[in-house]
From Swiss-Prot:
It comes from the Eukaryota. A divalent metal cation 1 binds at C8, H10, H228. Residues 413-424 have a biased composition (Polar residues). The keyword Transmembrane helix does not apply. It comes from Xenopus tropicalis. This is Lariat debranching enzyme. The gene is dbr1.
Length: 534
C-alpha cells in the first residue's frame, strides 16, 4: 500500500491533504494512509493555543478546529505523533492514544497500532535529559516551564517500547535518533544546515533515547522531522545470532510544509491484503502497557525504570503469549480500534471568538473507556483524584506565571506585516533560556537558511517514491544519498501517459495548468527564530 509520510505539519492540514489529492489525480494513484511526524498542532480553540509552545504573537488558529467540529472530514486516515509545538493540553487527554478528530488518530505518548497488517509505532515529543526521568505531572493551565516540559520524552515510554520483541514495520519519532547522520551523507546535510556541524562532529545532535530505541526495535522504516531538512540514511544492524540475517532500517527525515521544501514522500509498503481496512490494536503493546501500569509516575520527582542490576525483583516486562491471549479476551476478541471520538471542549467560532478562554484539565472519555477495558491507569483521572484529595506534590508550580491569562484579540490576527523577523527564516522563537545540554542548537540557529523563499503563491510538482534501496554514499563521495534518490526517481519521459518524478516541493514558480495554487496564511510564523531545543 502507499503511505504518505509528512515531516512537521505546523497546522497545515488543508495544504497537506490538498497536496496529496492533487498528486493522486496527477499520478493516477491512491494514497492509503498519511503519517505525520510531529508538530501537528491539533488546536481546537483559543484555550488550546495558549497551551502551545509558540510565542503569543505567532499563534494562529489554522483549520484543525474544522476537522474537530465535523465541518471537514480528513480524506485520508491520518496517524500522527506529537512534537514540540503542540496543543499539549489536548494531546494530554489521550496518553494512550485516540481520535483527535474523525479519521485522525494520535499515537499517544508512545504507542503501536496496526493497519492492513502493517505494524506502526511511534514516540511523541523531544528529548531533554532534565525531564527524562520525571513523571507526566503537567496539567493545564500550564506555566511557562510546564508548557515545554509537557512534551519532553519520559523514560517510561522508552522502557515500554524496549519490551517489544515482535518485528516493527514503521516507527516514528519527532527528533532524530542520535548518530543516524553517520549512516547517511553528512557532507550534504552540513551543506544544507551548516549550523549542525559542531553537534554532528561531537555526536550530540538528536535524541539518545530515540537512538536506543532504533538499536532495539530495528524497524524496516524510521521517519522523523524536527530539524527541517530532508535526509535519508541506511542503517545495517548487527546481530549476535549465528546464521541470522541482520536487519536494516531505512531512515528518512522530512522538512516542514513550506514553499521549496521537501516535506512529503510516498512510501510503498507491503501489507496483508487479508487484513481489514481499519486501525487495529497491537496485542503485544497492550500487554506491555498492562504489565507496566504500576511503574507510572505522576509527579515531577525522578524515577528510574527497573534494571537487571540486583536492585529489582523484576525487570523484564515483555509480553508472553499467555498475556496476549488475556488481552484478546479483555477486548472480546475484537482488536479493531473503536471510532469513539467525542468532543470534550467547545470549538473555535470565528464569528464569536473567546480570547479569554483558558484550557482546563479534562479527562477524555476515550481514555476512560480504554483504561476500563484493559485495567489500566488513567493518568489524568489519577492526577485529578490526587488533587482533590490534596495528597499530590507536583513541585512544579502550574499556577505561578500561568500562560492562561486573557490576551488581546489582536494576537490572533492574520496580519503579520508588523512582526519583526530574525535572519533565520526557519524557526519559531520560544524566548527562554533553558539549558542546551542535550542538543545545543539555539546559538547557531541565527544563520540564514540556504533554501528559503518568501514567495507566497505556489503550486506543486510531482512526488518522489522512496526506492527499495537507499544506498549511502561516503562523506567524500560526489553524490549524496539524496542525490541517488533523485537519480533513481527522476528519469524524464516524453511519451503520453508517462510521468516525470521530481521531489515534492511547494513551488512558487510553477504555473502549469492543473496546478493547485495555495497562498500562505502564516508565513511570518516561519520567518522567526526557533529555539528547536525546547
Amino acid at each position: 500500500m502507499k503511505i504518505a509520510v509528512e515531516g512537521c505539519c505546523h497546522g497545515e492540514l488543508d495544504k497537506i491533504y490538498e497536496t496529496i489529492q492533487f498528486l493522486e489525480k496527477k499520478e493516477n494513484t491512491k494514497v492509503d494512509l498519511l503519517l505525520c511526524c510531529g508538530d501537528f498542532q491539533a488546536v481546537r480553540n483559543e484555550g488550546d493555543m495558549k497551551c502551545m509552545a509558540v510565542p503569543q504573537k505567532y499563534r494562529q488558529m489554522q483549520t484543525f478546529y474544522k476537522y474537530y467540529s465535523g465541518e471537514k472530514l480528513a480524506p485520508i486516515l491520518t496517524i500522527f505523533i506529537g512534537g514540540n509545538h503542540e496543543a499539549s493540553n489536548y494531546l494530554q487527554e489521550l496518553p494512550y492514544g485516540g481520535w483527535v478528530a474523525p479519521n485522525i488518530y494520535y499515537v499517544g505518548y508512545a504507542g503501536v497500532v496496526k493497519y492492513r497488517g502493517v505494524r506502526i509505532g511511534g514516540i511523541s515529543g523531544i528529548f531533554k535529559s532534565h525531564d527524562y526521568r520525571k513523571g507526566h505531572f503537567e496539567r493545564p493551565p500550564y506555566s511557562k516551564d510546564t508548557v515545554r516540559s509537557a512534551y519532553h520524552v519520559r523514560n517510561i515510554e522508552v522502557f515500554r517500547l524496549k519490551q517489544l520483541k515482535e518485528p516493527m514495520d514503521i516507527f516514528m519519532s519527532h527528533d532524530w535518533p542520535r548518530s543516524i547522520y553517520h549512516y547517511g551523507n553528512k557532507k550534504q546535510l552540513l551543506k544544507k544546515k551548516d549550523f549542525f556541524r559542531q553537534e554532528v562532529e561531537n555526536n550530540t545532535l538528536g535524541s539518545p533515547a530515540a537512538s536506543e530505541l532504533l538499536l532495539h526495535i530495528q524497524p524496516s522504516y524510521w521517519f522523523s522531522a524536527h530539524l527541517h531538512v530532508k535526509f535519508a540514511a541506511f542503517m545495517q544492524h548487527q546481530t549476535n545470532v549465528e546464521g541470522e540475517i541482520p536487519k536494516a532500517t531505512k531512515f528518512l527525515a522530512l522538512d516542514k510544509c513550506l514553499p521549496h521544501r521537501e516535506f512529503l514522500q510516498i512510501v510503498d509498503v507491503e501489507h496483508d491484503p487479508g487484513k481489514p481496512d481499519c486501525l487495529e490494536y497491537d496485542l503485544e503493546w497492550l500487554a506491555v502497557l498492562k504489565a507496566t501500569k504500576d511503574l507510572l509516575n505522576i509527579t515531577s520527582k525522578t524515577w528510574n525504570m527497573p534494571e537487571n542490576n540486583g536492585l529489582h525483583s523484576r525487570w523484564d516486562f515483555s509480553a508472553s503469549e499467555k498475556t496476549k491471549r488475556e488481552i484478546l479476551d479483555d477486548l472480546g476478541h475484537d482488536i479493531k480500534i473503536p471510532c469513539n471520538f467525542c468532543m470534550t471542549t467547545a470549538c473555535y467560532d470565528p464569528n464569536n471568538p473567546q480570547y479569554k478562554r483558558v484550557a482546563t484539565h479534562i479527562v477524555n472519555p476515550q481514555t476512560t473507556e480504554f483504561c476500563a477495558r484493559l485495567g489500566l491507569v488513567d493518568l489524568n483521572a489519577k492526577i485529578r483524584q490526587h488533587e482533590e484529595e490534596g495528597d499530590i506534590d507536583i513541585t512544579e508550580d502550574n499556577e505561578a506565571d500561568s500562560i492562561g491569562s486573557a490576551e488581546d484579540p489582536g494576537e490572533y490576527s492574520t496580519d503579520t506585516s508588523l512582526l519583526s523577523t530574525s535572519i533565520n527564516p526557519d524557526e519559531i522563537a520560544l524566548e527562554d533560556d533553558d539549558d542546551q545540554e542535550d542538543e545545543g542548537m539555539a546559538e547557531k540557529l541565527g544563520e540564514p537558511s540556504p533554501d528559503y523563499t518568501p514567495d507566497l503563491s505556489i503550486n506543486f510538482s510531482n512526488i518522489r517514491v522512496l526506492p527499495d534501496s537507499m544506498a549511502v554514499s561516503s562523506d567524500d563521495a560526489t553524490d549524496s544519498t539524496n542525490d541517488e534518490l533523485d537519480r533513481s526517481e527522476s528519469s524524464q519521459t516524453e511519451g503520453e501517459g508517462k510521468q516525470s518524478n521530481r521531489p515534492l516541493k511547494r513551488m512558487s514558480n510553477e504555473n502549469g495548468s492543473g496546478g493547485v495554487k495555495i497562498k500562505r496564511r502564516n508565513q511570518a510564523i516561519y520567518q522567526a527564530k526557533d529555539d528547536e531545543d525546547e
